[in-house]
Amino acid sequence: MDKTNSAATERTMSAHREGHRPVHGQIRPSGRMARKGLLVCGILSSLIYVATVALAPMLWENYSSTSQTVSELFAIGAPSRPLVVPLMLTYDVLVIEFGLGVWGSAGRKRALRVVGGLLVAYGVVGLAGPFFPIHLREALAAGEGTLTDTMHGIITMVLVLFMLLAIGFGAAALGKRFRLYSIATILMLVVGGVLTGLDQPRLVANLPTPWMGLWERINIGVFLLWVVVLAIALLHAP
């Protein structure tokens, strides 16, 4: 009798455990909430960046958002640097968390997992940016550029590469509408990047660059918007 009762009890407990065991691919409620919290970080990251480039020029009387780059806002000796550096670091941390959220949302979509990994890499590399600032234009024109300027350029190129790759893999991860949107985003990034790059020699020579800041901000803006759209799409995914 004891053996019979013991076996029955074991079957009951086993059935109870099976009833609470998540189905393969199913996310626990607590895990789902954590994932959504990480995805919201993507939206917050874009808002932080926009707020930074909107507020920082107020600390620099002669700064022009149309003709000067974002990098100049945290250049060596820039009056806005003390504000921009912590905000940019916050932005990068939020992007890393968003990348983890994208990774956790990938399921069996390998392309989306790659997007998450690229966004994490983008954020990690971005954390180094404020520690390798450029010099102000006047210093560069006087030949006072150093290794930090070179490193800043390398970091920027790596970030752009991660950005383009993330959008490219993202285009393959979701539906047709998001794919077309991602392709349009890449095209805008390429055009904006070329226009910004053409003015780079003039920046170093401290010559007028009347539209350089605008082209760069359009470039940055389309990526920030893409991040928000991706976050919203994943937040609404089952």
Regions found by a protein language model. Give the residues of each.
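Hydrophobic, aromatic-enriched alpha-helical segments typical of multi-pass transmembrane helices
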Residues: 20-237
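Short, intrinsically disordered terminal tails adjacent to the first/last structured region
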Residues: 1-24
